[in-house]
Amino acid sequence: MNTLMRRACRRALFPGSFRLPALDPLNGTLMFSSGNACAAPVGCWAPPSGQDTGIKVYNSLTRKKEPLILADPTVATWYSCGPTVYDHAHLGHACSYVRFDTIRRILLKVFGIDIVMAMVVTDIDDKIIKRAKELNISPVALARTYEQDFKQDMTALRVLPPTVYMRVTESIPQIISFIQQIIANGHAYSTSQGNVYFDVQSIGDQYGKFNDSFCDAASESALQDKRHIRDFALWKTSKPEEPYWASPWGKGRPGWHIECSTIASSVFGKHLDIHTGGIDLAFPHHENEIAQCEAYHQSTQWGNYFLHTGHLHLKGNEEKMSKSLKNYVTIKEFLKSFSPDHLRMFCLRSKYKSAVEYSKESMHDAVNTLHLISSFVDDAKAYLKGQLICQPVQETLLWQRLNETKVNVKAAFSDDFDTPRAVDAVLDLIHHGNRQLKAVSKESSSPRSPIVYGAMVSYIEQFLEIMGISLGQNQVPAEERHSAMLFNVVEEMVSFRSKVRNYSLATNESATAIGQEEKQQYKERRRQLLLEREPLLQACDIARQHLAVYGINVKDRGDTSTWELLDRKEET
């Protein structure tokens, strides 16, 4: 549906009530406005009973941050809209799931809140039926293929699986029962054609918690037997050669929205803590989900917190990345050029509810940020091992910076999971750590301070683990991970090269050779040695360049050398 059609449809459904959503200039999130009293933030949402977790979340129901209150502060129920499995998942899907996975990890690992998550797999849908016909296979075979494909993609991205996946086709009896109860409660009706519709007018001002320029009527334009244009299908009569299930209203299949309401209620009952999905699902999908659940449970607040991720779009294109617009990059295509860690850092650099631009520049920033962190960790570990000789360290200052970082990161997480602020706090700590890791040629007589750097490394690695990022061998694709034997070979190679390099530079040897000779004679002797051994020094440089081709980065630190194994995708 194009923009003009959406506007016309919206005016037909809600005359005089709505303005188009604007973009918040501060954070890039959508702002909704409405003349409908119930659609305003005031009066439609009440803080749930329970204990305040100390976390603020942006609740799309109120369009502002609210305290996260849970009946049990150690457990949260979470329903996530899942994939419609008719094709490969793309990068827009990946960003949404990675962002919510980050929030889930923060709740669990920072605040100690266990998550019970259910995710629906829509395995019967108009798109699935259409694609199956094009490929001349059954809708079931198509759906199972792409369901498995989706799960493989999520595993590759290190997205934690939900507590339970629920397929729509395995929940048909529950869906039929759910619809029957809504009819019995006076909020739905069946027609002579075998369709069942939700009666939007029956719930009055309870409808309209989310408002957008999208309209569900166009997708159901062929369904002409409903009472009001705003009514939406709960059950659709089957068409020739389409899959169907027997029901009290005849052969048919469920509507889109009823699937999620039924499955979420079957797992969590009449109360839900957290509901998540992309911003495009807020209206009509989540709007209709709420209407159905509250009509079924006869309640006024079924879900307490609705969180939505912003769209991903390509540079220079304001439209969201989507299959229908054919402007997408599949997850598998992305992983040919970048690692899961790169995507996770890309997502961390923006707020989860903000729109985000995918471009060469934004990915370059993510890659460089990871490399900066990895380099600091390697340097700090080299200092711990005594391989990096530095000037005296201001230990008290670094302890202070580390403690401040811990406070700032937790404060950022408590403030609607503000990952950009948390990453910036860690990068600031690294900046101060790097300022004092300056190599010198001779070791000072002052005592070393390895403990504070050990604590910094431990905290940074813990932070990355919470974010789902794994430096070191897990950042490198499995087929390229070095074995213990290869590790030892490289270690010996770098050690041998370091000895040859020190011999080539002739610093210690020339001083020993000249004994008490005059300063000028010392310089002349060393110059001669450097000229004689220059081919060896060049060979050392060439060896380092050749090792870099295979992802082995050798760092010369005074009279010692260290090495690290890099993900070669960082060079793309």
UniProtKB/Swiss-Prot annotation:
Motif extent ('KMSKS' region): 320-324
Localization, UniProt: Mitochondrion
Keywords: Aminoacyl-tRNA synthetase, ATP-binding, Ligase, Metal-binding, Mitochondrion, Nucleotide-binding, Protein biosynthesis, Transit peptide, Zinc
Record's catalysed reaction(s): tRNA(Cys) + L-cysteine + ATP = L-cysteinyl-tRNA(Cys) + AMP + diphosphate; 2 L-cysteine = S-sulfanyl-L-cysteine + L-alanine; S-sulfanyl-L-cysteine + L-cysteine = S-disulfanyl-L-cysteine + L-alanine; S-sulfanyl-L-cysteine + tRNA(Cys) + ATP = (S)-sulfanyl-L-cysteinyl-tRNA(Cys) + AMP + diphosphate
One matching Pfam family: tRNA-synt_1e
Motif interval(s): 'KIIK' region: 127-130
Bound cofactor: record note: Binds 1 zinc ion per subunit.
Tree of life domain: Eukaryota
EC main group: ligase
Record PANTHER family: CYSTEINE--TRNA LIGASE, MITOCHONDRIAL-RELATED, CYSTEINYL-TRNA SYNTHETASE
UniProt name for this protein: Probable cysteine--tRNA ligase, mitochondrial
Source species: Xenopus laevis (African clawed frog)
Name of encoding gene: cars2
